[in-house]
Amino acid sequence: MARSVWKGPFVDGYLLKKAEKVREGGRNEVIKMWSRRSTILPQFVGLTFGVYNGNKHVPVSVSEEMVGHKFGEFAPTRTYYGHGADKKAKRK
């Protein structure tokens, strides 16, 4: 179920402050963050965030198409190694 419109998008407060500091400074550094649940806002476009996936910070460069999505969508938490091959077929 989608979030109610009257509530507005959720963004952690510290994230807004960090993004504002980087914009004011004019430098393009990676903003480390642990808030995968935060929504990407239009003012984040052009910035690079290091989204934590439980192991390391995955760099995510925010573009126009990402606005409205959550940061966690762009940093996968699980590694897919594929399904196991049939052992009988391997031996032949």
From Swiss-Prot:
Q: Which GO terms describe its biological process?
A: ribosomal small subunit assembly; translation
TM annotation in the entry: none
Q: Which Pfam families match?
A: Ribosomal_S19 (PF00203)
Is the keyword Metal-binding assigned to this protein?
no
Write one Gene Ontology MF term.
Answer: structural constituent of ribosome
Gene3D superfamilies the UniProt entry points to: 30s Ribosomal Protein S19, Chain A
Q: Which residues form the signal peptide?
A: none
Task: State the similarity comment.
Answer: Belongs to the universal ribosomal protein uS19 family.
According to UniProt, the name of this protein is Small ribosomal subunit protein uS19
Which organism is this protein's natural source?
Answer: Brucella canis (strain ATCC 23365 / NCTC 10854 / RM-666)
Q: Output the lineage of the source organism.
A: Bacteria, Pseudomonadati, Pseudomonadota, Alphaproteobacteria, Hyphomicrobiales
